[in-house]
């Protein structure tokens, strides 16, 4: 269910236009890089069109509220939207210093040409942020993350949660 009072933003890799406002399915943006120009607030949603494939990074920092999370997910019908990181990326999706955020119904891939230390699919980072509340990761298909096989610090991971600093 869509939280009341929020703004939906839409991204459509096939039919979108980065010069549009992104505020409706008909005026969807084309690229994930366009989403870096907005501030997501309580009740807002960032929705990627199903059956779309995005080559790029999804980087989000958002502060929702209890009962009014920021939702990053999918719209339309068909398979989950797929985000494939560029070759030398350490992550595909970065959720940084956020509260009350739900990430759902996405396919996340970070293959790269060769194995790489610290490569991950979804990275949740809290840095000098204190306590982060209610980060929900749901119905994600994370696969082909070609990270290092080291099973300690420096290894690869599908989901990596890091809390450092104060």
Feature-to-residue mapping (PLM):
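N-terminal pre-domain segments of enzymes
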Residues: 1-6
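The right-handed parallel beta-helix/beta-solenoid scaffold, focusing on the short coil/turn
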Residues: 7, 44, 56, 68-70, ...
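Acidic Gly/Asp/Thr-rich repetitive segments characteristic of extracellular carbohydrate-active
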Residues: 11-49, 53, 59
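Right-handed parallel beta-helix/beta-spiral solenoid domain characteristic of secreted/periplasmic
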Residues: 49-50, 63-117, 144-150
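Surface-exposed loop/turn segments connecting beta-strands in extracellular beta-rich domains
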Residues: 56-57, 110-112, 127, 140-146, ...
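Extracellular beta-strand/beta-solenoid scaffold signature
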Residues: 86-94, 115-128, 150-166
